[in-house]
Amino acid sequence: MWKLRIAEGSGNPWLRTTNDHIGRQVWEFDSSKIGSPEELSQIENARQNFTKNRFIHKHSSDLLMRIQFSKENPICEVLPQVKVKESEQVTEEKVKITLRRALNYYSSIQADDGHWPGDYGGPMFLMPGLIIALSITGALNAILSEEHKREMCRYLYNHQNRDGGWGLHIEGPSTMFGSVLCYVSLRLLGEGPNEGEGAVERGRNWILKHGGATAITSWGKMWLSVLGAYEWSGNNPLPPEMWLLPYILPVHPGRMWCHCRMVYLPMSYLYGKRFVGPITPTVLSLRKELYTVPYHEIDWNQARNQCAKEDLYYPHPMLQDVLWATLHKFVEPILMHWPGKRLREKAIQTAIEHIHYEDENTRYICIGPVNKVLNMLCCWVEDPNSEAFKLHLPRLYDYLWLAEDGMKMQGYNGSQLWDTAFAVQAIVSTNLIEEYGPTLKKAHSFIKKMQVLENCPGDLNFWYRHISKGAWPFSTADHGWPISDCTAEGIKALMLLSKIPSEIVGEGLNANRLYDAVNVVLSLQNGDGGFPTYELSRSYSWLEFINPAETFGDIVIDYPYVECTSAAIQALTSFRKSYPEHQREEIECCIKKAAKFMEKIQISDGSWYGSWGVCFTYGTWFGIKGLVAAGKSFGNCSSIRKACDFLLSKQCPSGGWGESYLSCQKKVYSNLEGDRSHVVNTAWAMLSLIDAGQAERDPTPLHRAARYLINAQMENGDFPQQEIMGVFNRNCMITYAAYRDIFPIWALGEYRCRVLKAS
C-alpha cells in the first residue's frame, strides 16, 4: 500500500540534510501493509471517479493523502454543515461555524513536522525528463518499482486529451511538446505501441497528424537527442562557451534568471559533448513511430527551427534565427575540431563544475525538476560510477507525488514553506487562536526550522549566487535557494506569531535571525524599486530576444513582480512595528520606492497582472495589500480606487469571482467557462476589498462573496478542488493544492473580524 512519509531519510547514507530532513515528503509503496478493506475501497473509488470524470474535472483533489490522514488524524468533531440561502443574511455565527469546520479539517491534514503536504504538479513535461534520464542511465528499474510505473502510466493515460494528445499542463490543449514526451514516457515505461486500450495509438496518431516529432519545441528536441530518437544536428546550438564569456557582457549566463541558467547549464554540457544514450530496441522503434518520413530521410537542418503551431507561445524573432544559423554553420564546426576543441573542452569542464556546485548546495535536490534530472544525467555522463550520481538518485523521490490521478513529477520538491506561511496568516486572521494553538505551534516550529542559516560557500560572485543567510526558500531548508517573497511571507507569519503568548504558539525567533531575514529582503530591491524572485535583475529585458524556449515567456532575466514587491513591503512594515529602530532609514526608503514601483506597473483598468497565480485577481490582491501596507488608502490613493472598481466589475452572478488560466496567456481578464465562481479567486478578491475598506462604503459585495464561500464548503469541512490556480512563465499552469483551504479560511476570517464584528 502507498504511504506518504514525512521527514524521513536519516538512515540513508546517500541523503544529505541540514536539518534532519524536516519538510521532506516522499511516497513509498510498502507491500507488507495491505490496508483495511474500507481504505482500499476509498482509494479505488477515488481513482475510478477521477478517470470517469477526467475530461470535466482535470484536476485531482489530492484524495490519497486525505484518505491516509483521515485514518492517522481523525477529526474529533465534525460540526453540522452550514448553508446560507439567497434571501438569508450572513451571520457572524454561521461564519464562525464554517471557520471552525474548515480549521478542524485543515488541522487534520497537517503533518507531524508542522507543514501541510500537498500536490505541486500540473506541468506534463516534467516526468518525461525523469523517465528518459533513468532509462539512459540504466537506473529505471532500480528507482521505479512496478507500482511506481503503474501509477505513472495511470497519470499519463488520465491526462491524455480527447483528441489523443497531451498538453503542456493538465488543463491545457494538446501540444507537440507534451504529446511526444508523454508518448515516449509510456513506451519507456514498458507500454507497447498499441496498448492502453488504444490510447498509445491515439497519441501517436495525434503526433503524426500534426507533423511528427520534428515539430517539437527546442527542449523536446534536446530530450529526444540524448535519448537517441532525434539527431543533435536538428538542434539549435547550446554552446557551453557562453560560460567562458566575460561577466561584463549582458548575455553572460550568470546574468540570467537562475531557473533559466540552471536549465541551460546542463543542456549546454550535454550539447557540447553531443551525448547520446544507448540505442535500445525501444529507441529504434521510436525513430519509426514518431516521424512522418523515414528517420534517415529527415532534413535535420530544416528541423532545427520547426515548431508546431500548437506550441508556439513565444515565436523566435528573426534575429534569433540568424544567430542560431550563424553559430550552427560557422562556429560549431570550429569548436568540434582541433584547435577549437580545446576551448570546447574547457567550457564543458567549467559547466560541470557549476553543476556540481548547484548539486552540493541543494543537497542534490537542485533548484527545480528540469535541472535536477539533467544534472543527474550529466553526473552519469561524466562518470557512471560517481558518488555524485549516486547522491542524486534518492532525491528523485522528493519530486514525485501521488494522487488519485496517478503519480506525477512536481514543479519543485514541494511548496512546504510557502503554504505553511500562508496557512499561519489565514489561521491567525480568524481570531480562533487558542482553539487552534497546537496547529499554530507546530507550524511555528516548522517555519523557524526552514530558515536558511548560511550563505553558500566560496566566492558568491564566482558562482553567480546571491546571499541566502536569513532567507526562506519556497520548499525546504535542504533545497535552500533564497526567494524574496518566501522570505517576506516567512517574516510576516513570524511577526504575527510573535504577538501571541508563547505558551500557545511556542517561542519566537531570535531577533538576530529576523535581522538576517530583513537584510535579505532589503538586498533584493532593484534600482527601480521592484523586487524580483531569487536575485536582482542582472541584465536587460531585450535579452528576451534570445529566449529559445518557444513555450515560455519572460524567462531570460529575473524580472521584478508585483507579488514579490508587495510581499516585501508587507514584511518590512510588520517588522518595523516591533523593531522600529532597526535599519529605520533603509526600510523607510525601501517601502517608498517599492510603493512607487507598484503604482507605476498598475494596468490602466486598475488591475495588476499576477505572474505566479491566476491572474488579475491574484496580482490585484498583492497590489492592494502592498499599497495599504505602505500607508495608502482608498481615500488618498487613486490606484486603490481603480483596483477596487476593477474587482467589483468582475464579480460573478453567484457572488464569487472565477478567473480562467487563459488570463495568464492572453494577458486579458478571462472568466471561467459559464461565469462560474472559484473559491480561491473569490477569497483573493474578498481579501483585497476588505483591506481597501469596502465594508465602510458598501459591504454588499462582501456579503455575497462570503455566502458563496460558505455554501461551497464540503460536508467534511474541506473546500472543493476546482480549476488550476498557479502559473509560471506566462504559459504553464501549476497546482497549489493547499490554496483551496488556506484562502477561503483567510477571507472568511478577515470577513468575520473586520466586517461583521466591526459593524
UniProtKB/Swiss-Prot annotation:
Tissue: Ubiquitous.
Keyword Cell cycle found: no
Catalytic residues in the record: D485 (proton donor)
Identification of the protein by name: Cycloartenol synthase
E.C. number(s) listed in UniProt: 5.4.99.8
PFTB repeats: 149-190, 514-559, 591-631, 640-681, 702-743
PROSITE patterns (UniProt xref): TERPENE_SYNTHASES
Family matches, as PANTHER family: LANOSTEROL SYNTHASE, TERPENE CYCLASE/MUTASE FAMILY MEMBER
UniProt organism field: Ricinus communis
Entry GO terms, CC: lipid droplet
